[in-house]
């Protein structure tokens, strides 16, 4: 990879935002990585959908997320469970044999990144 110094007017490559509240959260780094990717997708992707209450969500199988972060689907499932346990992700099964609707949540009082 070719590198260069950062100047006062840098051209940045595509990047993910890692919200600061994740730094002290007691979950594995992979869960933080999954959260950052899903947050980016729900805020910036055409794949995000909106429900009847105006809440944005993603409809993906774990396999798709696993391919994005180069992990196994079971690792993604474990990360999503960790995020659910701390209240940052809510999964809703709409029908059998369909992907979960994955709602990405922010801590109350935090501004949207």
Regions found by a protein language model. Name each.
Residues 1-63:
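Short recognition helix of helix-turn-helix/winged-helix DNA-binding domains
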Residues 45-106:
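Winged helix-turn-helix DNA-binding recognition segment
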Residues 108-113:
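Short, amphipathic alpha-helical interaction segments positioned at domain boundaries
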